[in-house]
């Protein structure tokens, strides 16, 4: 799905955008933003972010630098260390969960 969407955006960038001229008020352009959003967040969230961006790009809207938001980092908590409960936020890693090391520091 992402591949098809990216193909349509590239088609717009190559065939249609040069005929219309530069119109985007933001950096990166809306089409480049859409490509980055699809690459970073996938089809559903990428389309949502791109649609919101295109709706903001009008003469009475904002302008300037507006990057794609980074992908959220999930956090896990560690509990029961030295008979006290401590919560330590660390980036979630799948290999820790596979090795069953998620409940203690090491």
UniProtKB/Swiss-Prot annotation:
This is Putative membrane protein insertion efficiency factor. Its main location: membrane. It is found in: Cell inner membrane. PANTHER family: MEMBRANE PROTEIN INSERTION EFFICIENCY FACTOR-RELATED (PTHR33383:SF1). Pfam families: YidD (PF01809). Belongs to the UPF0161 family. Keywords: Cell inner membrane, Cell membrane, Membrane. It comes from Acinetobacter baumannii (strain ATCC 17978 / DSM 105126 / CIP 53.77 / LMG 1025 / NCDC KC755 / 5377). Could be involved in insertion of integral membrane proteins into the membrane. It comes from the Bacteria. HAMAP family: UPF0161_YidD. It is a peripheral membrane protein. The keyword Amino-acid biosynthesis does not apply. GO terms for cellular component: plasma membrane. InterPro entries: Membr_insert_effic_factor_YidD.
